[in-house]
Amino acid sequence: MGIQFSVKSVFASATLLLVATAAHAGITTYTSQSSYLAAVGGTGVDTFDDLDVSDYQGPLTRSAGSYAYTVGTGPNSSQIWGASDDYSDIWLTGGNRLDLVTFAPSTPLAGVGGFFFGSDLFGFSTPASYLTLSATDSAGATVSYRLNTPTFNSFVGFVSTGNLVSFSVTAGNQPGVWATVNDLHLSVATAVPEPETYGMMLAGLGLLGYIGRRQRQRA
């Protein structure tokens, strides 16, 4: 009876911990590409290198690896531009510097990220004071992050315990600066054992401990 009480107590504590974790579910912000990748499962990347340095009528339907999404801009212009410093590494920006560039995954995804910086009227990278990035998930949670003095290598990623439904970036009203994204990352969640699996693991550990004690008593 004592062993049964012990296992049940541990299992109950673990269940309460899982419930408490779920109650604080939401969106986590990452500013390191390696940390972001460590927090997600499979990831696809859209490099935008198939785009011409030209304008496109949005919204566009694209994919990052096997993960489809749409990208649009607004409210002032629906134009989307492929842009570059060297016509080799292409990035994506909007047609109006005041607009939001918004990404919407077509399938349930847990993470979105990329490299964010400013570009000028001609699409060349340019210094920006800040960019504002926002993500919303299927539970209604929304997180905004202000990326100060972004550079070409500034990475930001969002990971949700639910499914992300939209992600946007804007440069606000900074003269001569357009919000720009390169190497968009879309990711599924890391596989996490179900509560039942945790319970089986804990019960198994309790049984192993009991067997070990019985063997020592017999020795």
Regions found by a protein language model. Give the residues of each.
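Bacterial N-terminal signal peptides that target proteins for export
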Residues: 2-11
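Sec-dependent N-terminal signal peptides
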Residues: 10-17, 203
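Extreme N-terminal export signal peptides that direct proteins to the secretory pathway
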Residues: 12, 25-26
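N-terminal signal peptide c-region/cleavage motif recognized by signal peptidases
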Residues: 20-22
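Surface-exposed, well-ordered secondary-structure segments
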Residues: 26-189
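A short, hydrophobic C-terminal helix/tail in secreted or cell-surface proteins
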Residues: 193-213
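Short, charged juxtamembrane terminal tails flanking transmembrane helices
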Residues: 215-219
